[in-house]
Every structure is written in structure tokens, then in C-alpha cells.
Amino acid sequence: MDRVLSRADKERLLELLKLPRQLWGDFGRMQQAYKQQSLLLHPDKGGSHALMQELNSLWGTFKTEVYNLRMNLGGTGFQNAERGTEESGHSPLHDDYWSFSYGSKYFTREWNDFFRKWDPSYQSPPKTAESSEQPDLFCYEEPLLSPNPSPPTDTPAHPAGRRRNPCVAEPDDSISPDPPRTPVSRKRPRPAGATGGGGGGVHANGGSVFGHPTGGTSTPAHPPPYHSQGGSESMGGSDSSGFAEGSFRSDPRGESENESYSQSCSQSSFNATPPKKAREDPAPSDFPSSLTGYLSHAIYSNKTFPAFLVYSTKEKCKQLYDTIGKFRPEFKCLVHYEEGGMLFFLTMTKHRVSAVKNYCSKLCSVSFLMCKAVTKPMECYQVVTAAPFQLITENKPGLHQFEFTDEPEEQKAVDWIMVADFALENNLDDPLLIMGYYLDFAKEVPSCIKCSKEETRLQIHWKNHRKHAENADLFLNCKAQKTICQQAADGVLASRRLKLVECTRSQLLKERLQQSLLRLKELGSSDALLYLAGVAWYQCLLEDFPQTLFKMLKLLTENVPKRRNILFRGPVNSGKTGLAAALISLLGGKSLNINCPADKLAFELGVAQDQFVVCFEDVKGQIALNKQLQPGMGVANLDNLRDYLDGSVKVNLEKKHSNKRSQLFPPCVCTMNEYLLPQTVWARFHMVLDFTCKPHLAQALEKCEFLQRERIIQSGDTLALLLIWNFTSDVFDPDIQGLVKEVRDQFAAECSYSLFCDILCNVQEGDDPLKDICEYS
């Protein structure tokens, strides 16, 4: 045995078989270890392809060398036996495998010669007439129970019922490859020399065992070939040391049987695990389609669920039904579907689908397994307990709908629409301002100081506090306050943009005037006189100011290309900025700083989106008529914005964090000091108003601090009052003529024409406009 493999290959083979060195040559244990390691190392079982290939190579070499060693043991191989005999009348051809099969005359003669070399006192077993007449394969054994051997019987026995000699190995088809054989007849004559005492038993160390036959047994004419199942049987018994007799086919069959036997005994069968037979009923690839709507189909999700459905074989589902207690199911049921089974269970705690599947996969290493979470437990239970499903068992009698429904709890949430309506009614486009109002509304209404005063500047609060108090309480504990307010502000901007698209500029002007008249209508007597003082101040600002204001409003409303821009030019403190601010307040617009660098001008112009008018405030130029003025980049920037000023084509306006929007740039009111304008810029202004310093107007403002504190001069309501005070109601839109007349009558009741003339005289004299008329506080 030491010559079978090299020392390195022998140690490597024992290492792969995981056997100690002293078991080298014990073919039975080595073959058993080979089967175990093949299951572990096979790639289909999760093993290593390289190790499996190496093990097959070494094991194939080992078996081939053992076979060659056995055939040439002691220098006397079967090849040296006589090839013919006159006794049998059968002359085997060269290398005829069946000529030296177990029990034949040549087999007996060969081994008798072998034993005589080792034991000169060895004698062949005696031949009997009975054994000659009825030849069979058997061996002599020592009697253990009785000193006298039982008489021979002629009772035939099946080959499977023969007694086994412990010193001789069972037939093994997997030891040697199928040698070439000569086609012979099925009913060939049996050699006369092949008698029942054809040979003695052999010990593992080569010694002989002598005994007496227990009787000859007849064999069928065509004994079936030996086929190993699940691998080759061991070459020897558990106490053999490596030398044992191989197995051979007792009788050749037809061509199909020879081919099948050759394939089963081919050397390639030892190089890899034989392929598994395909299942007659392949495992399903998914749950039945009737359950699709009740299962979660998420694969890469860590979400936890309380209900699960496991799909496997019937046997595995029954086993899982008994062992699923690890998850402490509150309810579980076992159902059958076609050739498989399903386990449906609910737990009081939530688990991941992967955790349930990993636990079930320990019991389903071969059987198919599918596991999914159940999103609709009650509906799923109703389906799996009806046809075509079959309910087998459940731990409690069914599920009921009331187990999944709680008593309805009224959970009030913030009314987002109510917040949006509040912002839209008051034209609030600042999210923080909306949030501030609503947080203020959460206070108790009876104890609210702002509501008790009812001041004009607080009218948004005291008009809406009681209406929004309940919703504000919910808003106070809401986690989405900023989102709600941002959405409300976006709604105001969206409504404003929609108006610009759907309404004409005349309609927008009418709406703005209507809002101003409503505010004027709510003024008290003292506030009314204060606004009339502002009207008197404006009438002293420019000659025929009411007509000038009317022309400006008409110019800005009609928005004719190249005939729509207004320029206010004059020295410092001449009233330019105050009038421009009042126009912006009346019409709705924004003030822009155009003196910034050109790279920042794009975002500054983006503020003009959705505006009725804009104001370029305090534009600076390079050439000043007054040497005390500082130069700036405003006029140069205006010269680069000719398309913006003309209003003939749409321009792109952009804001931060938003896309560019293409629209016509709104008409502008530009204020500036005494700077020289180039002809290209001068041509863009259709109306130019030159302001001059009037000391009496400045003195009147200084002496009446309320005009400055309440910003009456910069208010658009002052200009609206000036219009209705100096023009008849026929000039206004018919829709607001009634309101115009009502507001005019209200102010006429507070201030007569003679009283207004007194206010006008006070302004022209540089005194307090309300001197000797009203004590304003």
C-alpha cells in the first residue's frame, strides 16, 4: 500500500479525508470519509471547487493504483493463468474478464497457487460430488454454534440470501473500471472445474481460513449485476487492512444493460458528485396570485411587521407550525395549497421579514421556502381559509374584524386651508409673518390686549383672532409650522401671479384703489384730518399736482412700450422719494437698488417678478451737475438695460433658488439727483418731473411730526384720498364709484372745504398743517 501513492500525495489525501495516518490502507474507512468530504466540498453544496477537484484526482489515482496492485499482487496476476481448459470446453479469449471471475476454475486455481507460496502446508478444499453437480459460489467457515457441520442441502436460495464471509469483501462495482469482455451467450455452459469448494477464505494479512461447507446452494441462471447506491461499498470489512476481493458482474446482459453498467461504473463517476434528478414537481417561484394584494413585496427593506406568511412544503410547514413559538405568535394557522403548505401567523411585536425567513431557513435547507410580510392580515386570512386553500389547523378559532379595529378617536389637525385663506385675505407673502400672527392667535381671546384696543395698525390681529383661535391652538403644537406657513405664502404669490395673467392692468388698478378706499373708510376723525394734511402737502409739492398724478397713473397703467417710464429729478430733500414711495404703495411694487455692480444686478432685477411697477431709487451717474454729488454706476446700468426699460420684449428675471422666468419688465419710476443722462437713457423716460426744494414744505413736515411718524406722505392711501378729493366719481371705474362717493362724503363730514383751505394755508406758510384745527395725539 505504501507504493500506491507518493508520500506527499498520501499525506494530502489523508488531510483532505480528515483521517489519521494510521488508517492509511483501510479502504472501507477511507471510502466512507471520501463520501462525507464529497458532500462538504462539492460546489453545489457550498464547498470549494478546487479542493473537490484535488480530492477527486487523488482518490481516482488511489483507486486505480489499488486495482493495479490487486491484479498484480505477488507477481502472479490473472494474466499468467491458463487461457483455456479441456474440462470446461470453454476457451476464454485474451483478457476475458469473466474467465477469472469469483468462483470460476481459474479464480480457484490462481488463488490456490498464491496461498501455497505463503503457506506450504496449504491444501485445496476437497471436492464433492454434490458441489460438482450443483456448482455455486460459497466459502468454507468455521462452525461457531455446533462442532458438527450441518448436512448439505439442495434448497435453492436467492443470491441475496447467501451468508457473507467476513474475510472476503462484498462485490463492489466501483473499484475497477469495466475491462474489455468478449460477447458470449446468455446460456453458456458452466465450467466443470468451478465447484462449490473452489477456494478458501482469506484473512486480512493474507492467511487462509479453512472450514466445512454448510451446503451448496443453487443460483439463478442470470444473477443480477451488483449496483452500488449512493457510492461504492467498502472493499473490505471494518477489520480489513486494505486487501480484499473486488466485485464482478456474474453474467453479461444485452447491449443496453452493458451500456448502463459501463456508465455507472465509469471512472468519471468518481470525479464529481452525480447530478441530482430533476424534481417532477418544481418548486413554485412565488406566492399564489390571489394573495398578491395582501402581501408586502419589498425586498431591501428594514421595516417591521406583525403578520407573516410562510410558503413551503407540507411537511416543513407542519414542522414550522410547531416550532414558530420563538416569535410568540398570538395567532397561527396551517393551510395546504396544492402540493405545498402555508403558515400564517400574527405576533404582538413587530419583526423584520429577514429575521423570520432566516429562522425558517434553518429547517428548510433543501425544501423551497418563501416568506413575506402581510399588510392586510384580516383579508389575507379570509382568502387562505377559503377554496382552493385548505385549512388544516389553527391555535384559536379564527380571526375577527373587531380584533383589528379600535374605537375611533377624533384627532384634530391643523386646517392648512384656513391658514392659507388668512394669508390670502391679508395679502401676507412672508412665511415668518404668517407664523407670528398664528402663534399670537393661540392666546386667550378674552384676555388679549391687542383685541381690546382695536387699533388701526393691529386690525389684522383683532379682526381674525377669534376666528382662528381654535385652529391656532392646534398650530401651536404642530411640528410642521414652517411648512404650513410657507405653503400659505406660496399660495399668496401664486394668486398674485394668476391675477397678473388673467386681469388687465386697469382691473388691477381698480382693485388697488378699492383696497385703499376701504382702509380710508375705517379711519377715525383725527386720522382723517391727518391724511387730509398729507393731501394738502402734496398739492403744494407740484403745480397742478392732481392732474399730474392722474397722468402718471394713466401712463403706468396703460404700459405702452417706450411711453411708460417716469423720471423724478431734483436736488436733495425735494420730495422725489416720498412721492415715488407713495406710488409704489398705491399701485403695488418694489424698490430696486441699481447702483450695485453688474454681476449682482441679475438677482436685483429678479425682485421685479409679478410686480405692477418698480422704482429705481436714487440712481447715481458718472457726470454730476452738482459737484458735491458722488458718482455711481446706476446710469451706466440703466444704459445696459434698454430692453428692460422699453418693455417691448420679454426678459428673463431670476431669483435665488428658483428658475428664470420670462416676462415683460414692469414700468418704472426712477428718482435721481442732478446727474447728466446720456441720450440712450433719456429716450427711455416718457415723463420727466423736475423737483425743486421748497423750504415751507420741509418746515411743515418738521412741525408736524405725526406726518413723518405715521408715514402719511409715503402712503398710497394719501394719494387715493387726493384723487377722490379733487375728482368727481365719474372719473373712476363704475364698480367703485359708490365706494368713492361714500368715502368722500365721510371725509367731507369731518372736514369742510373751508377747513381744508386752512390746512392748505398752514402748509404754504410752513406751519403745522393742523395748527389751530386739531390736537393730534
UniProtKB/Swiss-Prot annotation:
Keywords, ordered alphabetically: Acetylation, ATP-binding, DNA replication, DNA-binding, Early protein, G1/S host cell cycle checkpoint dysregulation by virus, Helicase, Host nucleus, Host-virus interaction, Hydrolase, Inhibition of host innate immune response by virus, Inhibition of host interferon signaling pathway by virus, Inhibition of host JAK1 by virus, Interferon antiviral system evasion, Isomerase, Magnesium, Metal-binding, Modulation of host cell cycle by virus, Nucleotide-binding, Oncogene, Phosphoprotein, Viral immunoevasion, Zinc, Zinc-finger
Entry's localization field: Host nucleus
Bias-annotated ranges (Low complexity): 228-242, 259-269
Record-linked SMART domains: DnaJ (SM00271)
Positions annotated to bind ATP: 570-577
Motif, Nuclear localization signal: chain positions: 274-281
Documented EC number(s): 5.6.2.4
Cofactor: Mg(2+)
Posttranslational modification: Phosphorylated on both serine and threonine residues. Small t antigen inhibits the dephosphorylation by the AC form of PP2A. O-Glycosylated near the C-terminal region.
Family matches, as Pfam families: Polyoma_lg_T_C (PF06431), T_Ag_DNA_bind (PF02217)
One cellular component (GO) term of this entry: host cell nucleus
Modified residues (N-acetylmethionine): 1
Extent of motif LXCXE motif: 137-141
Boundaries of every SF3 helicase domain copy: 544-704
Cofactor descriptive note: DNA helicase activity requires Mg(2+).
Zinc finger (T-ag D1-type) boundaries: 411-505
Residue span(s) of domain J: 12-75
Major localisation: host cell
Single Gene Ontology BP annotation: symbiont-mediated suppression of host innate immune response
DNA-binding region(s), chain positions: 288-402
Modified residues (Phosphothreonine): 273
Record field: compositional bias (Gly residues): 194-204
Subunit (UniProt): Forms homohexamers in the presence of ATP. Interacts with host HDAC1. Interacts (via LXCXE domain) with host RB1; the interaction induces the aberrant dissociation of RB1-E2F1 complex thereby disrupting RB1's activity. Interacts (via LXCXE domain) with host pRB-related proteins RBL1 and RBL2. Interacts (via C-terminus) with host TOP1 and POLA1 allowing DNA replication. Interacts with host preinitiation complex components TBP, TFIIA and TFIID to regulate transcription initiation.
Domain notes: The J domain is essential for multiple viral activities, including virion assembly, viral DNA replication, transformation and transcriptional activation.
Name of the protein in its database record: Large T antigen
